[in-house]
From Swiss-Prot:
Region (Disordered) residue spans: 200-248, 267-287
Name of the featured protein: Harpin HrpZ
Protein's organism: Pseudomonas syringae pv. aptata
Lineage: Bacteria, Pseudomonadati, Pseudomonadota, Gammaproteobacteria, Pseudomonadales
Subcellular location: Secreted; Host cell membrane
UniProt Sequence repeat ranges: 211-217, 266-272, 277-280, 312-315
Pfam families: Harpin (PF04877)
GO biological process per UniProt: monoatomic ion transmembrane transport; symbiont-mediated perturbation of host programmed cell death
Family: Belongs to the harpin HrpZ family.
Keyword set, alphabetical order: Host cell membrane, Host membrane, Hypersensitive response elicitation, Ion channel, Ion transport, Membrane, Repeat, Secreted, Transport, Virulence
Length: 342
């Protein structure tokens, strides 16, 4: 991610003299922005300007343009952009966001920039999908962020099985509608990435993890398992249907089969417990006991292998989500930066 330098010299710009306090309004009163946050706001506003006007080619530029239009400030200059961005940050991240940042300098101010961008990216995830009958829709304007979410899903097929279009990236190209199942999968991905953005925001602020995200954002959360995890799906409680027994039997069979595969691959079953044989009559019981022990060992081995794979999958998914979260933060200003470099 391209960093935004926040050294003191770079922040001493003509725009700094324009808006150091958020304008008072009938509803909010005086600004709660700290001076450190005001400096970050000015720097971001300058990044979003092109030829004296707001450049709405980036995701953050689009969001800010919509906000300014709603307030009757469309087409405004740097003063209006700074004021609108300051207002947007407080709306999305809280009235007291950045209130204690005045003592920060150098790296601390750069961390505040990271907090702002991570927080805004996280808040924007909420608005990527619009609920509709039978599923959800999305806007072409949000494709820079949506495509990165879809790529994350394609990179983790165990967690997000391919849709009928062949890939989640292709799914976004077919039309702007996702059915119920695809919406659930997409929201699961949003939850996981939202958690990573929250972690980045907290880490930059030197805070303990806030958790939360956009719901229960964990790759194995209560409602984010889109792969039908057999450990969760095979419910055998009294409220289940008549198929519970057969499902439980199938689950046990799968564990035993997995355990057998592990043994054949060199896993072993450990050292069996030998029971003295006391004659032919006891041999039948001994054989049954040996079989029970064998099946029990295979079952345990299969369970261990399944849990190990699940743990590795969770680690891989979270690592991938962290990378996508960083890309999303960079994407907020990407349109503006690409044009500036051209």
């Amino acid at each position: 991610m391209q960093s935004l330098s926040l050294n003191s010299s770079s922040l001493q710009t003509p725009a700094m003299a324009l808006v150091l306090v958020r304008p008072e309004t009938e509803t909010t009163g005086a600004s709660t922005s700290s001076r450190a946050l005001q400096e970050v706001v000015v720097k971001l506003a300058e990044e979003l300007m092109r030829n004296g006007q707001l450049d709405d080619s980036s995701p953050l530029g689009k969001l800010l343009a919509k906000s300014m239009a709603a307030d009757g400030k469309a087409g405004g200059g740097i003063e209006d952009v700074i004021a609108a961005l300051d207002k947007l940050i407080h709306e999305k991240l809280g009235d007291n966001f950045g209130a204690s940042a005045d003592n920060a300098s150098g790296t601390g101010q750069q961390d505040l920039m990271t907090q702002v961008l991570s927080g805004l990216a996280k808040s924007m995830l909420d608005d990527l999908l619009t609920k509709q009958d039978g599923g959800s829709s999305f806007s072409e304007d949000d494709m820079p962020m949506l495509s990165k979410i879809a790529q994350f899903m394609d990179d983790n097929p165990a967690q997000f099985p391919k849709p009928d279009s062949g890939s989640w990236v292709n799914e976004l190209k077919e039309d702007n509608f996702l059915d119920g199942d695809k919406t659930a999968a997409f929201r699961s991905a949003l939850d996981i990435i939202g958690q990573q953005l929250g972690n980045q925001q907290s880490d930059a602020g030197g805070l303990a993890g806030t958790g939360g995200g956009l719901g229960t954002p964990s790759s194995f959360s209560n409602n984010s398992s889109v792969t039908g995890d057999p450990l969760i799906g095979a419910n055998t409680g009294p409220g289940d249907s008549g198929n519970s027994s057969s499902e439980a039997g199938q689950l046990i069979g799968e564990f035993i089969d997995r355990g057998l595969q592990s043994v054949l691959a060199g896993g072993g079953l450990g050292t069996p417990v030998n029971t003295p044989q006391t004659g032919t009559a006891a041999n039948g019981g001994q054989s049954a006991q040996d079989l029970d022990q064998l099946l029990g060992g295979l079952l345990l081995k299969g369970l261990e292998a399944t849990l190990k794979d699940a743990g590795q999958t969770a680690t891989d998914v979270q690592s991938s989500a962290a990378q996508i979260a960083t890309l999303l933060v960079s994407t907020l200003l990407q349109g503006t930066r690409n044009q500036a470099a051209a």
